[in-house]
Swiss-Prot record:
Biological role: Catalyzes the NADPH-dependent reduction of glyoxylate and hydroxypyruvate into glycolate and glycerate, respectively.
Listed EC numbers: 1.1.1.79, 1.1.1.81
Organism: Salmonella enteritidis PT4 (strain P125109)
Keyword Acetylation: no
UniProt keyword terms in alphabetical order: Cytoplasm, NAD, NADP, Oxidoreductase
Domain of life: Bacteria
Identification of the protein by name: Glyoxylate/hydroxypyruvate reductase A
Residues of the active site: R227, H275 (proton donor)
Lineage of the species this protein comes from: Bacteria, Pseudomonadati, Pseudomonadota, Gammaproteobacteria, Enterobacterales
Amino acid sequence: MEIIFYHPTFNTAWWVNALEKALPHARVREWKVGDNNPADYALVWQPPVEMLAGRRLKAVFALGAGVDAILSKLNAHPEMLDASIPLFRLEDTGMGLQMQEYAVSQVLHWFRRFDDYQALKNQALWKPLPEYTREEFSVGIMGAGVLGAKVAESLQAWGFPLRCWSRSRKSWPGVESYVGREELHAFLNQTRVLINLLPNTAQTVGIINSELLDQLPDGAYVLNLARGVHVQEADLLAALDSGKLKGAMLDVFSQEPLPQESPLWRHPRVAMTPHIAAVTRPAEAIDYISRTITQLEKGEPVTGQVDRARGY
């Protein structure tokens, strides 16, 4: 079995060695320009067109949970990968726990009014504030995939009312499920904290805009953990300035790194992190990839395959 590997920033030697240990019958090599030798599987991130074009691969693994970048490239270069070759994304591989940590810590930060207390501290004001109740602090999750399910599961333990919005109906215990555009308003109008975990598709680009934000209760919060292109940043800032939104926590941006001139840097009610909410953990990724390749070789059912038409 031949496996080719390409990632512009990962420690390639470590990955090659770890994959060969996990798959003793495989030969793993770093792909370099001019390498047209046969391969059965390709593990990639931001691959050049020539790496995949014309190859008779059994499968391709994108080395991340998000596949919007590689799908965009495949759409621009359809000769790059035959539609019959399955494309897989990393399923969880430690990202679920990281998303849980991030979401729970931020929801609790807002719920306990730590943002307000930080503002008071900056003014040297000693002023206890009224507490919020859980009943008024409904959390709504846009995007009900693997990571959305993990976040909902972690928040359940804290007793917040939970709801999700997705393409298909979910039957998660303790979570109200809303489906499609026709139920979006009902989902939004009782959501105090909006968590975005949607995939990046043509239908979701710019979805967090003034029209959507206006449907949230006054004083709502937005937590974006998905993609920066989901948010119309000017609309978000306008909602913050008007008081419609009380705060926003952003891990992703339409342009990364975020330009120095962006007003998001200086807005007092915007907090941010540099796209670190959930990163690929190599050991967990190796385990998922090696297990999935073994299942494919045996003809067994697998999970994590991308629906290229849907975009996730």
